């Protein structure tokens, strides 16, 4: 009995605060006055009401910095997605043609259809694929620890953590960070925009960003309180340390205006965008900076080689042997070289600066000229004889000592053509033939 009394006193002095029953006896009146707080007894009028937008497709697509970005929708079931798709179609038809709002609506429609396809497909068919904000995330099987999550900026431990990589922009992140991503895939920007910022570090100041990161809107300042502000040399904007890792990249504006290829610090988003744009021929140097050809001799040489290759192209298209040998495929990495002579990619400028492109293009030019002038009889038969001096050597429009008539494309020796620039024998012959065939056309 003495032991039981001690045990009771101990329990009364050491009550468990998490024990809803309590060690002490409750008065019956208290239990009646305070009914148990069960969820089933709560009045329906006390439940907060959540007002949804009128249209399903408007969920999460408002245009302020703190809303969900385009492509992230609250609609999660198939019925809501189908309704949102129909509403988006109707909006596209109602908006002005080729307007920015109509383009945004088309992008939203693409997002909705991709999400609907992801829900319709069985999980067993593509268990390793996740589609989010135009990212196509595939589950990685690498166990290496050399990767860093682009979202949380921590190491990815491949042995114990599941992680994904976007096939479009190489964005890597943990599986737990996928739903936290707010930045769309930059490949969509490359597809729609496909142009560079051509102003050198167009800084506007932290006040224009409301002292927040240009990407994630985290508060930043130059004094590193609460977070350090890092400037991107490409966009001129400021970013937090999670969005700016001090990556280095060549800035297109500095290369075009100053012929400067020194890598500068850029944000993660700018680095991925510049990497995707590196091989795209979007720079028309003669319009952006025509004086560059007066100061960079390598550019003049490359332009002459490209012009010669364009003159050789008709020979290869009509030559069976050249088509079988696939000579033009030697330029498959730079397809724009066989289409025009004035468009350049940033990779072209880098290779011109280092001297690699000049050597490569000279070798290809030599191979092409050898086929036309020596190896192929059909191509040799398409050569020209100078009608001004009547010498027997065969001329081609890409020869360095020749000139081409702008009207009839006849080829002459350069000296002969300039000495008789007032008259072209072939043009005169064609004009006389035309008058003979159409005598009624004469005045």
Curated annotation (Swiss-Prot):
Zinc finger residue extent: Phorbol-ester/DAG-type: 134-185, 364-424
Protein's UniProt name: Differentially expressed in FDCP 8 homolog A
Domain of life from the UniProt record: Eukaryota
Free-text function comment from the UniProt entry: Positively regulates lysosome peripheral distribution and ruffled border formation in osteoclasts. Involved in bone resorption.
Keywords assigned by UniProt, alphabetized: Metal-binding, Repeat, Zinc, Zinc-finger
GO-annotated molecular function: zinc ion binding
Region (Disordered): 1-49
This protein's record includes keyword Protein biosynthesis: no
InterPro entries reported in the protein's UniProt record: C1-like_sf, DEF8, DEF8_C1, Multihaem_cyt_sf, PE/DAG-bd, RH_dom
CDD domains to which the protein is assigned, alphabetical: C1_DEF8
Taxonomic lineage of the native organism: Eukaryota, Metazoa, Chordata, Craniata, Vertebrata
Family under the similarity heading: Belongs to the DEF8 family.
Family matches, as SMART domains: C1, DUF4206
GO BP, sorted A to Z: lysosome localization; positive regulation of bone resorption; positive regulation of ruffle assembly
